[in-house]
A protein has these predicted regions:
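Ligand-binding loop in jelly-roll beta-barrel domains
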Residues: 137-170
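N-terminal, Lys/Arg-enriched amphipathic/low-complexity engagement segments
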Residues: 12-109
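A short beta-strand-loop-beta hairpin characteristic of the jelly-roll/cupin
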Residues: 107-129, 138, 142-144
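Generic beta-strand structural signal
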Residues: 105, 125, 131-133, 143, ...
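Conserved, well-structured core segments that form or line functional sites
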Residues: 159, 166-196
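Short, conserved beta-strand element in jelly-roll/cupin
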Residues: 100-115, 134, 164-168
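Low-complexity, intrinsically disordered or signal/transmembrane-proximal segments
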Residues: 7-10
Length: 196
């Protein structure tokens, strides 16, 4: 993602993947690196949108909402990061209440904190701690992504990436699907650095 200033070089990289032993891949070197920050990042096709949310929410209350003043937060459209966190489109619990998507896929990686997902296919559940959700909107899906504040004694950190991938024209009206990849089942890769 991001604009490339140089052509990538090729090298053979050995990846150690657990629980497998190892594989060898020939792949391009990193094309560009973007500073990790709050909000959208530059993208190139087929990436439509990539965003990083890093919020340090206050302790939660019994409704999983912030047990703190909402003064300075633009309720319903809060992206200002006042006090180190945003409510986004949430009115009580932070997050994104029910909204539609069509013609693309979303990949959501919840590194820390939790996401409560519900959708028009009847799926629902909570994920976090390294879990990955892959949703194909295709012909259309409505879903909600809310960030419950479960800890009532200390701050609730949310560290989340979401990437939107454009579907090719022939797949834009594909049936919508939803898949979870739980952290403990995702192989981990540790690359050896190519000689430079």
């Amino acid at each position: 993602m991001g604009g490339a200033s140089n052509q990538p070089t090729q090298c053979e990289t050995k990846f150690w993947i657990t629980p497998l032993t190892h594989i060898r891949l020939t792949m391009p070197a990193v094309v560009s690196v973007e500073r990790l920050g709050q909000g959208p990042m530059p993208t190139d096709s087929p990436f439509l949108f990539a965003v990083h949310h890093l919020d340090t929410y206050p302790a939660g209350d019994a409704k999983m909402a912030p047990a703190a003043s909402l003064r300075g937060h633009n309720m319903g459209a809060d992206f200002g990061h006042a006090d180190g966190w945003s409510m986004y489109h949430g009115e009580e619990v932070p997050g994104f209440p029910k909204h539609p998507h069509r013609g693309f896929e979303t990949v959501t990686i919840a590194r820390r904190g939790y996401v409560d997902h519900t959708d028009s296919l009847g799926n629902g559940g909570r994920f976090g701690g390294g879990d990955v959700q892959w949703m194909t909107a295709g012909a259309g899906i409505s879903h909600a992504e809310m960030f419950p504040l479960l800890d009532q004694a200390k701050p609730n950190v949310l560290d989340l990436f979401q990437i939107w991938l454009n579907l090719p024209k022939k797949n834009k009206m594909a049936p919508p699907t939803f898949k979870m990849m739980w952290a403990e089942t995702i192989p981990r890769a540790s690359p050896q650095v190519c000689p430079g």
